[in-house]
Design a protein with these regions (language model features):
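Bacterial N-terminal signal peptides that target proteins for export
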Residues: 3-17
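N-terminal post-signal-peptidase region of extra-cytosolic proteins
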Residues: 81-83, 105-115
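Short nucleic-acid-contacting surface segments enriched for D/E, G, S/T with interspersed K/R
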Residues: 112-128
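Structural detector for short beta-strands of small beta-barrel domains
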Residues: 40-44, 55-91
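OB-fold (S1/OB) nucleic-acid-binding surfaces
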Residues: 86-105
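N-terminal intrinsically disordered, low-complexity, charge/repeat-rich segments that act as generic
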Residues: 2, 28-58
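OB-fold/S1-family single-stranded nucleic acid-binding modules
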Residues: 131-142
Length: 142
């Protein structure tokens, strides 16, 4: 005759709850580093070190209206400021972008400028809202 401990079902339940909580916390935001903003869910980027690769930039709107999700808008970069690197080698550049309708937004571009270039004055960029204040920008090839 096998004797089954009474706590066995309770321990399985607790383990299951722990796994669910850990999975949901991890999947909500990809780990970005202690002093960096979290990378939004659904963005195919694991680290801010990758931001700007192949001319694709994840940007956070600092001033101006957030863009609608999945609606591309064209803009022209007007400036590039505040690009000093932090302890992790990441710059948090501020860029003003003039949109096709004449309005302007200011974004934060967190990236490693030694790996991927800053957005520059005159760059033509396609912007698409992701969620909240997050937008994805893709440079047009010159």
């Amino acid at each position: 005759m096998r004797i089954q401990p009474r706590l066995y079902p309770v321990s399985r339940l607790l383990l299951g709850v722990f796994v669910l909580i850990a999975t949901s916390v991890y999947s909500y935001n990809v780990h970005a580093g202690p002093d960096q903003p979290p990378i939004p869910r659904g963005v195919a980027m694991k680290s801010w070190q990758e931001n700007g690769r192949d001319g694709r930039y994840l940007l956070q709107v600092l001033q101006g209206s957030a863009l609608k999700a999945a609606v591309p808008v064209t803009g022209t970069v007007k400036n590039d400021t505040d690009c000093d690197a932090d302890a992790e080698g990441l710059s948090h550049c501020h860029n003003t972008i003039e949109l096709a309708n004449g309005t302007r937004i200011t974004v934060i571009n967190t990236h490693n400028m030694h790996r991927n270039r800053c957005l520059g004055d005159g760059d033509l960029i396609s912007l698409t809202g992701i969620n909240g204040s997050w937008i994805m920008g893709s440079l047009f090839r010159k």
